[in-house]
Amino acid sequence: MAAVINRAFGAEIAADISSYTDVSQSAWYYNDMAVAVNMQTFEGDGSGHLYPENYITREEVFSVLARALVYETDDFSSLNKFADNAQISQWAKEYLSALAQRGYISGDENSNVNPQANITREEFAQLMHNIFKTYISLPSAYSYVNDDSVMINSSGATLVNVTVNGDVVIGDGVGFNPVS
């Protein structure tokens, strides 16, 4: 998950994660975990663990994405529409609520968000599509984008006469280079 989020947002700068006892420097995912910690999408459990080899739950993924997008709220009323809202961990409510308020998560046919279930690749791909209808990764001029949120992860990208009704997210990979 860290690798996918880092690449999607173009994040490259790593933090010192030597205080996390479950991430070996020789592990293939070490740098991705360090970048995710620096990006503040991965926070650990407060006792020195990131659990990099565990499956990731739906509420954990929702939280990672909301932190990456800096979506915050203290209004949890949007969680009331989920039949299983009592299963949402207290620490995750802010993040799930922020995504639900924006319509990015809506629950299944039974109005369940299944926060404790492991997320599948298909569910993750759908969530990313729900958030970013347009993903720009090449330097070029774009005269059409879907009217929802747009992720720009390339310097030199230019939006020409476009209206975006959602968010325009400039990925870390753009750095200080121009986007217009």
Which positions does each model-derived feature cover?
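Feature responds to low-complexity, polar/acidic, surface-exposed segments characteristic
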Residues: 2-31, 38-59, 65-93, 105-122, ...
